[in-house]
A protein has these predicted regions:
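Short, well-ordered alpha-helical segments enriched in acidic and aromatic residues
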Residues: 16-33
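A beta-strand edge to alpha-helix "cap/lid" segment located at domain peripheries
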Residues: 33, 51-112
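Generic hydrophobic alpha-helical segments
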Residues: 9-10
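A short gly/proline-enriched turn/hairpin at secondary-structure junctions
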Residues: 31-43
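Alpha-helix N-cap/N′ positions at the starts of helices
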Residues: 2-5
Length: 112
């Protein structure tokens, strides 16, 4: 499975709230940098899973990837994601040894 295929499977498992599958795409030492009004850095698989599960608790929102671009080595993937409300983010995923080791997420637009 290529990194882009893994990323789309990762997105699918997030939308399905299949945390068992979701966590298999993450390195134990993954970091997630969330850039909004402030910067938050979440480190480690456990912290990442805790943060994402809290965000989706009792929240049925789904998202889709509207654009992506791969680096020549396919280890970096830039995405534009849009949720059901029209909120946008630019997320950059970094892969090492077939796992996501870093995500930088820029919150771009809140729906009106």
């Amino acid at each position: 499975m290529t990194n882009i295929e893994k990323l789309f499977a990762f997105f699918d498992s997030e939308n399905q709230r299949d945390w068992q599958t979701y966590q298999t795409f993450l390195s134990d030492h993954v970091s997630w940098e969330l850039e909004g009004d402030t910067t938050e850095i979440i480190k480690g698989k456990t912290g990442y899973l805790t943060k994402i599960q809290k965000a989706y608790h009792n929240n049925p929102v789904q998202f889709r990837c509207t654009y992506y671009q791969l680096s020549p080595d396919q280890n970096r993937i830039v995405t534009i994601l849009e949720n059901d409300f029209g909120d946008l983010s630019c997320d950059i995923f970094f892969f090492e040894k077939d796992l996501i080791v870093k995500e930088i997420e820029y919150l771009l637009k809140k729906a009106d």
